[in-house]
Amino acid sequence: MDIAGRSLVYFSSVSENTHRFVQKLGIPATRIPLHGRIEVDEPYVLILPTYGGGRANPGLDAGGYVPKQVIAFLNNDHNRAQLRGVIAAGNTNFGAEFCYAGDVVSRKCSVPYLYRFELMGTEDDVAAVRTGLAEFWKEQTCHQPSLQSL
């Protein structure tokens, strides 16, 4: 599973659940800070938690599910242009709104929703994400035009 040179960007609140999941992946990743801004210069997959579950109808109102730091990050046109896919964390207690932030980002940014996991994820989630990312980046690379084909 070669994912070297492929970028992960994630946000984790003070609970650190998403951070712990990303650490278990063992893949270099850039963290969106709680305060301040960053800019990413290469294609990436975003991993984010879902906020506010259980308080709105997901079919009607997407407000509050995506952390404000992620919204600010994606409102930067440069960062948004590099986004290739999204993975979301959530809590199954919120039913249909489980990992709903991933649905919001996928829809608004027109990128694939690659995976969802609960809280800090399980060992099976870690293995599935590592394998899935390797396959995803391989597919992305296959669809890049080479200089010879231009």
Curated annotation (Swiss-Prot):
GO BP, sorted A to Z: protein modification process
Top-level taxon in the UniProt lineage: Bacteria
GO molecular function: FMN binding
Pfam families named in the record: Flavodoxin_NdrI
NCBIfam families for the chain: nrdI
Stated family: Belongs to the NrdI family.
UniProt-listed PANTHER family: PROTEIN NRDI
Its biological purpose: Probably involved in ribonucleotide reductase function.
Protein name (database record): Protein NrdI
Species annotation: Mycobacterium tuberculosis (strain ATCC 25618 / H37Rv)
